[in-house]
Amino acid sequence: MLKLAFITSHAPSLTHFRGQLIKMLCDKGIQVFTFAPNFDDETRMAVQSLGAIPIDCSMSRAGMNPFVDILNTWQLARLLKRIHPDIVLNYFIKPVIFGSLAAKWAGVPYRIAMIEGLGFIFTPGPTGFSLARRVLKRLVMLLYKLGLSCADKVIFLNPDDQNEFIAAHLLPPSKTFLLGGIGVDLNKWPFTPPVVESLTFLMVARLLREKGVEDYVNAARIVKKINPQIRFILLGDLDDNPGAITRSEVQAWHDEGIIEWQGHVPVQPWLVQTSVFVLPSYREGVPVSTQEALAVGRPVITTDVPGCRQTVADGVNGFLVPVHSPELLAEKMITFMQHPELITSMGLASRQLALEHYDICKVNQRLIQLICSKTSKCGQCPPSVAAS
C-alpha cells in the first residue's frame, strides 16, 4: 500500500484546505498520515473521519530559534522513519524548509514541497524593504535553498513566486510545478445573485497590514463621504504576526462607523449578502477567500500583485488597482456605485472564471497525478504529468 504523509505547521489547514484531497487519496487506497503540531480534539477527529491518521509533531509556526528548529527536524525525521512513507508533501514555510530536510534524513523516496505564498518577508512596504526585512529575506532565501534542495518537486500557486525562486537560483525550473489556486468546492459555493440595490463591500482576511486592511478602511472613508449608506464589512480574526492590526485599531474603525467588523465568522452567509468582494493585499499565493468570492459570483477589486492579479481579468470580472493606493481603490468602488449593472455582469464573469480555473475537483486531480507520478505502487492513479 502506498503511504503518503502531509506535514504542516497548522493543523486546522488539513481539513479546511486539504480535506477533499485527503479523502480522495484515502478513497484510492492510499494510506495517509498527517503531521502537525497542536492537534485539538475536533481537528483530530475530523482528520480521522477523512480516513487519515493524525500524528502530533513539534514545530514552531513562527519562532526563529535555530536550535529548536534543528531539534524538531531531527524528531520529525525519527517519526517519519517509523512509518516509512513513500511520499511526503510539505506546505507552509517551516514544513517546506524543515519538513523537506526531515524527509530527506528519513530516506523518504519522493518529497514534494508546496509554496502557498511568500508572506510579509517578501512583501515591500510603502517605502520599499527596510534593512531588517532585507536581512531577514536573505536569511529565509538561504533556508529555502537548503530545504528545497531536499525536495524532488516544488509546487507554486502563481508564476511570480515560481519565477522569483528560479531567478534567485533557489531551484532549477525542472523541479517546479505551477498549480494555480488550490480551488474551492463549486457545489458548496454555488452562484447566488449579487446584491445590487444596497451596495455592500466585503473584505475577508487575517487582520494584517500586508493584507491591505488599512487601505480598505481608508478607501471606505473616501466613499462614505459621497454616500454614507454604503456598507463596508470586514471579516477576519486578530493575529500575533509582526504586521498585525491591533484590537484597539479595528475597534476604533468599527466604532467610527467606517467598517463593520464581524471578527472570525463563517464567510459564506456574508458573501451572499454582498455586492463586491475586495482584497487590497500586498502579496498572496492565490487567496482562497477570493476564489470563494468568484465561485458565488461576486465582482472582485484586488491589487495588481503576485497571487491577486491571477483572480481578476481587469474590466471583465472586476478591477485591478496598484498596491498602497486607497484613493484608486475608492475610485473603483465608486464605479460600482455609479454603474450598478456591472455588479451583475462582472459577477457572472467571476463565476465563469471559477468554473474554468478554481474547481477543486480538477485541481486535486492534477495534484494526485503529480503525487503518483514517481511511484509504481499507485496503480489506480492517472498517468504522470509533466512539470508545468
For the regions a language model picked out, list residue spans one by one.
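Short hydrophobic beta-strand element within catalytic cores of glycosyltransferases
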Residues: P299-T302, V312
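Glycosyltransferase donor-sugar binding loop
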Residues: F35-D41, V204, R231-I245
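Nucleotide-activated donor-binding/catalytic signature segment of Leloir-type glycosyltransferases, i.e.
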Residues: G236, I245-H264
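Donor nucleotide-sugar binding/catalytic pocket of nucleotide-sugar-dependent glycosyltransferases
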Residues: I55-D56, K137, M141-F191
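Aromatic "clamp/platform" in nucleotide-sugar-dependent glycosyltransferases that forms part
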Residues: Y282
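Conserved acidic donor-binding segment of nucleotide-sugar-dependent glycosyltransferases
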Residues: D314-G315, F319-P326, T335-P340
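A short, well-ordered alpha-helix in the C-terminal region of glycosyltransferases
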Residues: L328, T335, L342-H357, V363-I368
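A conserved mid-protein helix/loop that constitutes part of the nucleotide-sugar donor-binding site
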Residues: T15-Q20, L199, M203, L208-I222, ...
